[in-house]
Amino acid sequence: MKISNICFSYQPPGESHQEVMERFIRLGVASEELNFDGFYTLEHHFTEFGITGNLYIACANILGRTKRIQVGTMGIVLPTEHPARHVESLLVLDQLSKGRFNYGTVRGLYHKDFRVFGTSQEDSRKTAENFYSMILDASKTGVLHTDGEVVEFPDVNVYPEAYSKKQPTCMTAESSETITYLAERGLPMVLSWIIPVSEKVSQMELYNEVAAEHGHDINNIEHILTFICSVNEDGEKADSVCRNFLENWYDSYKNATNIFNDSNQTRGYDYLKAQWREWVMKGLADPRRRLDYSNELNPVGTPERCIEIIQSNIDATGIKHITVGFEANGSEQEIRESMELFMEKVAPHLKDPQ
């Protein structure tokens, strides 16, 4: 089992940007001190939902302050930057960290990102997949080559050469299209923390079927499960503090994108739009019901309940790497205490899939 920490870098009401960034650094360092296997962060722009806009710089900081843990992105928004810039940043971090950087990617969701950076949101899937393949190929061959579908330029050598023989990487996958793209290439996917186990199982079944058809060893692909976690010996306190955080956090998430508006006609996000409609039909548009749903799915409560939730996900999906976010625990001291309790009373009891 691998257990990593994930930091969203959300700016709660009343906190300054400086406080959020200083906490981000301390949580990264604490992750190594507490024997987590990794520390991951997310890219967002123009919203308090997450204020680490440049993950290459953010990860470089944490890599420079640690010696052992893997530091990764979950993920880099691929369509908003040129693939040559992406691959150079990836290779520099791979060399400087001696292979401790995990290159996690996403296609992007937030309309402001695409508008400001000057790229098409409706073409984001095609662009992300095209760039991702180019970048990973270049990290292996040392040559950045384009097929001309999205961008076109002569082949160029990229520097420095990769440190890692096989680049640690992953991509967040929710729709069948993304899952199929990754499975065809045998690339790892990240599963969402806001869907039930049954849906995660369906995603894994689709992935494994397609990957096997394309000759990949499905037992040798390191997928990642994600969770929001609040662990406390007092289960009611864990539930309450998590709700206080998530109530504002969910509102910030919904307000940062217009994808969920009924009037939005952006193509290419059918899965997320359908998911939101299903939530509305279940009453989950109501903040209280949404928090009930979230806390039921995630390790929120006593150590025993956290073990039960996570282990059931591990056994159902066969995934051996989990990332756990602790920012929903209140103050920085409370976040640290929850991390400590997790590593003391939850992590030792998590087993490989049965």
Curated annotation (Swiss-Prot):
Keywords: Flavoprotein, FMN, Luminescence, Monooxygenase, Oxidoreductase, Photoprotein. Signal peptide: none annotated. Its EC number is 1.14.14.3. One of its GO terms (cellular component) is cytosol. One of its GO terms (molecular function) is alkanal monooxygenase (FMN-linked) activity. InterPro entries: Alkanal_monooxygenase (IPR033924), Bact_Lucif_Oxidored (IPR050766), Bacterial_luciferase_CS (IPR018235), Luciferase-like_dom (IPR011251), Luciferase-like_sf (IPR036661), Luciferase_bac/NFP (IPR002103). The keyword NAD does not apply. GO terms for biological process: bioluminescence. It catalyses: a long-chain fatty aldehyde + FMNH2 + O2 = a long-chain fatty acid + hnu + FMN + H2O + 2 H(+). Gene3D superfamilies: Luciferase-like domain (3.20.20.30). It comes from the Bacteria. Light-emitting reaction in luminous bacteria. Belongs to the bacterial luciferase oxidoreductase family. Heterodimer of an alpha and a beta chain. This is Alkanal monooxygenase alpha chain. It comes from Photobacterium leiognathi. The lineage of its organism: Bacteria, Pseudomonadati, Pseudomonadota, Gammaproteobacteria, Vibrionales.
